[in-house]
C-alpha cells in the first residue's frame, strides 16, 4: 500500500478499510491534471525561493517522465496506491529521490484534489461545448434545406397548425444554443484556482497563488481557502447543464422515435444508426434514440446524488466529497457519447417531405386560418370559431380535409365564404402569413438561419 500518511498510527490499516477508502480506481482519470498542477506548484515554489531551481528542474523532469510513461502505457496505474496523488508522488520519489519528497511543500491533498477536479471539469466543459457545436451544425444544415418543407405542428401530440421542418428544427437549435451559453457561464464562473488553500486555512509558506493560477490558465486564485477546498458548486452546475442537454436530447429522441414509426413515416433513420431484431427479420429499430432517452435518467441521478451528498456537509473538506467523482464521471461520459451519436444520426437521417406535407393537409392544421378568414370578413372570432368547428365535423363525417370540401358546403354553414377560401387555407398561405419574428414563414425563418450562421461563426 502506498499512502501519504501514517506517522501517528500504531497499527496497519485494515485491508477492507484501505479498499473502502481508496479512490485510485476512479481518480486515476486525473493523472494528467494532477501532474500539470504539480508542475505549476513547484515552478511557483522555486520562484518564491522555497525550492532551488535545480530541485524544480529535477522534479519537473521526473513528473514529465511519469506523464509520458502513463500516456504510452509503459507505466500502469494500479490499486497499490491509495489515490492518484500518492501514485504520482511515490513514482516521483522513486525516480528523483529526496527532491521528490519536497513536491508537497505548501500543499494539502484537499487543495490538490480541488485543483485536479477543476482542471478536469474545465477540460470537459470545453469538450462538451465542442459536441454541442456539432449538434447545432447538424440542426442548422437541416434548417437551411427545409425552409418550405411543410409539416404539422403539434400540441398534446395532436396536429395543431402547419409549420415547416426548418421551424421545428429551429426550436432545437434554440435549446442547444442555450446549452452552449450555459457551458460558457460555467467556465467563466469556475475559473479560479484553489491551489494554495491548503487543508482549509492556507499555509505559512510565502506562496504566490496568483502566479500559480496564471500558470494554470485561471483568472485568479480563490479568495477564501475554506471555500476553495470545499466548493463543488461548479460541478453541480455542470451536472445540471448536462441534465438539461440530456433532457433536450431525450425530447428530440422521442420525436425521432415517433416520426420513424410506420404510423408517421416522417423520417427514416440510416442503417448505420439502426438495429434489428433477433427474431423478427423485418424490424429496423431506432435503438440509438431509445437509448439516449433511457440514459437521461442516469445523468439526472448523478446530479441528484451529488446534491444529496453535499447538502449536509459542514465546512471545510469531508471524506463524503470523495463521492463527487464516480457518478459525475459516468454522467460526463454518457452525455458526450449521446451528443456525438445523435449528431451523427441527424446528419444521416432522411426526411420524408411529401409524407410530412400530406400529414399536415389531413390533420385540419389549417382550421385556425379558416377562422381567421371569417374574422377578416367581419365575423367575430368566437362565432368564426364555432362555424369552423361545424366545418371540421362535416369533413370528419365525409373523411376529407377542409381543402376538399366543396364551396357550396362552406356556404351552407356561412355565406361569407367565397372561392378564395381555398387559397387562404392552403399550407403555403397558412405558413407564409405567419411572418413575425420566430414564426415559420420563409422570411422570418431565413432571417433566423442567417442569424444562426453568424452565431456559429462567432462560436
Predicted regions and their residues:
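A helix-coil-helix interface module used to build multimeric assemblies
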Residues: 1-202, 207-213, 275-276, 287, ...
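Glycine-rich cofactor/substrate-binding loops
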Residues: 2-37, 98-99, 280-459
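Short runs of predominantly hydrophobic/aromatic residues within well-ordered alpha helices
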Residues: 38, 85, 89, 235-238, ...
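Short, well-ordered beta-strand elements within core beta-sheets of diverse protein domains
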Residues: 41-51, 164-167, 236-244, 369-378
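Structural signal for hydrophobic packing residues in well-ordered secondary-structure cores
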Residues: 46, 63-74, 92, 96-100, ...
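Conserved hydrophobic residue
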Residues: 50-51, 75, 264-265, 380, ...
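A generic structural-conservation signal
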Residues: 54-55, 152, 222, 383, ...
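Charged, flexible cofactor/metal-binding loops and thiol motifs
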Residues: 122, 129, 144, 152, ...
Amino acid at each position: 500500500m502506498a499512502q501519504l500518511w501514517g506517522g501517528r498510527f500504531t497499527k496497519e490499516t485494515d485491508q477492507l478499510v484501505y479498499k473502502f477508502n481508496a479512490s485510485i480506481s476512479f481518480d486515476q482519470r486525473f493523472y494528467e491534471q494532477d501532474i500539470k498542477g504539480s508542475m505549476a506548484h513547484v515552478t511557483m515554489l522555486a520562484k518564491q525561493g522555497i525550492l532551488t531551481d535545480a530541485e524544480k528542474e529535477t522534479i519537473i523532469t521526473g513528473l514529465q517522465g511519469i506523464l509520458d510513461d502513463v500516456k504510452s502505457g509503459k507505466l500502469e496505474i494500479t490499486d497499490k496506491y491509495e489515490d492518484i496523488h500518492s501514485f504520482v508522488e511515490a513514482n516521483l520519489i522513486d525516480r528523483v529521490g529526496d527532491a521528490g519528497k519536497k513536491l508537497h511543500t505548501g500543499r494539502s491533498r484537499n487543495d490538490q484534489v480541488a485543483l485536479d477536479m477543476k482542471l478536469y471539469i474545465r477540460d470537459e466543459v470545453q469538450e462538451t461545448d465542442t459536441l454541442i457545436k456539432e449538434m447545432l451544425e447538424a440542426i442548422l444544415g437541416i434548417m437551411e434545406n427545409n425552409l418550405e418543407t411543410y409539416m404539422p405542428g403539434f400540441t398534446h401530440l395532436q396536429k395543431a397548425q402547419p409549420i415547416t421542418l426548418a421551424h421545428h428544427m429551429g426550436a432545437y437549435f434554440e435549446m442547444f444554443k442555450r446549452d452552449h451559453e450555459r457551458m460558457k457561464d460555467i467556465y467563466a464562473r469556475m475559473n479560479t484556482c484553489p491551489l494554495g488553500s491548503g487543508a482549509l486555512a492556507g499555509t505559512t509558506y510565502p506562496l504566490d497563488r496568483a502566479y500559480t493560477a496564471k500558470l494554470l490558465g485561471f483568472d485568479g486564485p480563490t479568495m477564501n481557502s475554506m471555500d476553495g477546498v470545499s466548493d463543488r458548486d461548479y460541478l453541480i452546475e455542470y451536472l445540471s447543464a448536462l441534465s438539461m442537454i440530456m433532457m433536450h436530447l431525450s425530447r428530440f429522441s422521442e420525436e425521432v422515435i415517433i416520426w420513424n414509426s410506420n404510423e408517421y413515416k416522417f423520417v427514416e433513420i440510416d442503417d448505420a444508426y439502426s438495429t434489428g431484431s433477433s427474431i423478427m427479420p423485418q424490424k429496423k429499430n431506432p435503438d440509438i434514440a431509445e437509448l439516449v432517452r433511457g440514459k437521461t435518467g442516469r445523468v439526472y441521478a448523478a446530479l441528484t446524488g451529488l446534491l444529496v451528498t453535499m447538502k449536509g456537509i459542514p465546512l471545510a473538506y469531508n471524506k463524503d466529497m470523495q463521492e463527487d467523482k464516480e457518478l459525475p464521471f459516468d454522467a460526463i461520459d454518457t452525455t458526450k457519447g449521446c451528443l456525438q451519436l445523435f449528431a451523427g444520426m441527424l446528419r444521416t437521417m432522411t426526411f420524408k417531405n411529401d409524407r410530412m406535407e400530406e400529414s399536415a393537409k389531413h390533420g385540419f392544421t389549417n382550421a385556425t386560418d379558416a377562422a381567421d378568414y371569417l374574422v377578416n370578413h367581419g365575423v367575430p372570432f368566437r362565432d368564426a370559431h364555432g362555424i369552423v368547428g361545424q366545418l371540421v365535423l362535416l369533413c370528419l363525417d365525409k373523411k376529407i380535409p377542409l381543402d376538399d370540401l366543396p364551396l357550396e358546403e362552406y356556404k351552407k354553414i356561412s355565406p361569407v365564404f367565397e372561392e378564395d377560401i381555398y387559397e387562404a387555407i392552403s399550407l403555403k398561405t397558412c405558413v407564409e402569413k405567419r411572418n413575425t419574428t420566430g414564426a415559420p414563414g420563409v422570411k422570418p425563418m431565413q432571417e433566423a438561419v442567417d442569424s444562426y450562421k453568424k452565431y456559429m461563426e462567432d462560436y
